Amino acid sequence: MRSKVTGAQRWVVKIGSALLTADGKGLDRTAMGVWVEQMVALHEAGVELVLVSSGAVAAGMSRLGWTARPSAMHELQAAAAIGQMGLVQAWESSFAEHGRHTAQILLTHDDLSDRKRYLNARSTLRALVELKVIPVINENDTVVTDEIRFGDNDTLAALVANLVEADLLVILTDRDGMFDADPRNNPDAQLIYEARADDPALDAVAGGTGGALGRGGMQTKLRAARLAARSGAHTIIVGGRLDRVLDRLKAGERIGTLLSPERGMLAARKQWLAGHLQTRGTLVLDEGAVSALSQGNKSLLPVGVKQVQGGFRRGEMVVCVAPDGREIARGLANYSALEAQKIIGQPSDAIVGVLGYMAEPELVHRDNLILV
């Protein structure tokens, strides 16, 4: 299984706030230099690299002398603006010592939710990788709002892995990996070395929240691994403070937790759909529609929908659930919520008679639908 790591040619490496700022003491330039040295070695070995770096808010807090993470959005954004300057300068100077160029990219959820901007971001990242430049990516915390934020950089890293079609997502954290119990409370906790990303048993052991500086706990890392698996990427969750951690991963050493995809890689458009984390409404299906969608490659017709919840416009993402509330799929609606309310339960040839027009015979076309 570790051969999937040693043979990976395109890596996305995500480094969390606690690691980068020595648990809030300011940017740890020494640690950054050690990781850069290893990333340069990977680069020299032919590995293509994208770095997702947390730490802007934490670095800004340190510069401002704040000891507690603020809850007010404007204060968080001010800290991010201050910290991002130092963060990107630190990465740039450290990579430059080894003759490597870096590029700063700041993203919001809107950038990846809009198909055109998504494709532009993908083209830019691919161009940078081909130029052997190392992109340094962070969420654009200075302009993002709660409604359009990724929520944590683990999720952002997974979406970037999908964006660049990475073979491997490496999440460096302050834990050695995922354990079968909380090692802080249970001395008998055992490291989970390998598992399928979609194994439901992992949910029970991934509980808990992130530290005071960051937003992501082990649950967000598991969610990120599952998202990355949609594009066929393997994910390793591993301790960033382990000696020569990236070198050892490349050598195939059995450290950290390797989470592997169960299914094959999704088509490019469906990878984009998988990254649509924000939904605007819910469609409650009947059992016939649930059965049809579960077989795959089927569109959702109005006749199979029992109820419409929420307010959404045409082209926005909706959740499709079974009568018992289980999420079955997500997709882009061909009709607004108001229009959908009028045509659900009706055969497609009745749409014109109800609305006076027909945009599409399907409520959600199979090309715009992804099973979950």
UniProtKB/Swiss-Prot annotation:
Pfam family of the protein (one): PUA
SMART domains: PUA
Record's keyword terms, sorted: Amino-acid biosynthesis, ATP-binding, Cytoplasm, Kinase, Nucleotide-binding, Proline biosynthesis, Transferase
Binding site for ATP: 14, 173-174
One example GO MF annotation: RNA binding
Keyword Transport tagged: no
Entry function: Catalyzes the transfer of a phosphate group to glutamate to form L-glutamate 5-phosphate.
Cell inner membrane keyword on record: no
Family statement drawn from the similarity comment of this UniProt entry: Belongs to the glutamate 5-kinase family.
PROSITE patterns attached to this UniProt entry: GLUTAMATE_5_KINASE (PS00902), PUA (PS50890)
Subcellular location: Cytoplasm
Pathway(s): Amino-acid biosynthesis; L-proline biosynthesis; L-glutamate 5-semialdehyde from L-glutamate: step 1/2
CC annotations in GO: cytosol
Principal cellular location given in the protein's record: cytoplasm
Cited Gene3D superfamilies: Acetylglutamate kinase-like (3.40.1160.10), PUA domain (2.30.130.10)
Domain PUA span(s) in chain numbering: 280-358
Gene Ontology annotations of biological process type: L-proline biosynthetic process
Annotated EC: 2.7.2.11
Entry protein name: Glutamate 5-kinase
Reaction equations catalysed: L-glutamate + ATP = L-glutamyl 5-phosphate + ADP
List of residues binding substrate: 54, 141, 153
